[in-house]
Amino acid sequence: SEDYGFFDGKEKDRDKSVIFASVATLGRPEYLNETYFPADYFDYVIIDEFHHAVTDQYRRIVDYFQPQFLLGLTATPERMDGKNIYEICDYNVPYQISLKEAINKGMLVPFHYYGVYDETDYSGLRIAKGRYDEQELNQAYIGNERRYDLIYKYYRKYRSARAIGFCCSRQHAEDMAKEFCQRGIASAAVYSGENGAYAEERNEAIRKLKNGEIRVIFSVDMFNEGVDIASLDMVMFLRPTESPVVFLQQ
């Protein structure tokens, strides 16, 4: 549409009625100034994943622009670091809905949650900022044949056609993709800076999953937010997290 534009690493539209902007690009000093974007340039500003609004990158945008209306959207307003996003909006919450309510109203797909005990002992592992130590998790997971068998058993039991597995590291994602491929389940690993034997670029992996070329994507922090793959019928949490934000988003 002629009324819609983008402001990101590739496009720099400014003369559109609606602009979809990348936070990483728009938040740079060369764009947040009176010459490029005056503070009152936008009448209406919508910020998705608003729980990030207290971080430096988002805060530069929030503090700079002076729109007539600012709307923040998030499914996970509570942060592990204790920072309060409600302060940014003067505690003005026009609408909120719980996960259960959203499912009951047909806004989200209902799901069955199954917890499977795999005998991994996490009690001695280090935790920093809601994340377990990556190397210690690698040692617990990679090469663990009993865990491989258990994951594969329940994957087969619930007869998934298209699945995503959340892994703790690049090595873990590669290892799981390799293990599933060896068992006859076409799989790919998706992570930043993909360079492994089973690695695929994010959009290409999604395309292959939708087309049935692969059946499982093993990912590391690439599908945590803003993802809608309607054909998915299984999500596998293959690593722990102390962060309720990460858990709910995934």
In which residue ranges do the predicted regions lie?
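Conserved interdomain linker/interface between the two RecA-like ATPase lobes of SF2 helicase motors
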Residues: V93-I164
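Post-DEXD/H (motif II) to motif III coupling segment of the RecA-like Helicase ATP-binding lobe
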Residues: Y44, H51-Y113
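SF2 helicase motor core recognition
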Residues: P29-Y31, G106, V216-V235
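Conserved helicase ATPase core of P-loop NTP-dependent helicases/translocases
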Residues: D3-D15, Y31-N33, E174-D175, I185-D221
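Conserved helix/coil segment N-terminal to the catalytic DExD/H
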Residues: G9-Y41, T55-R60, M222
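Conserved RecA-like ASCE P-loop NTPase motor core of nucleic-acid helicases/translocases
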Residues: S1, A161-S169, V190-Y191
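Structural recognition of the conserved hydrophobic beta-strand(s) that form the central parallel beta-sheet
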Residues: I19-S22, Q68-A75, V216-S219
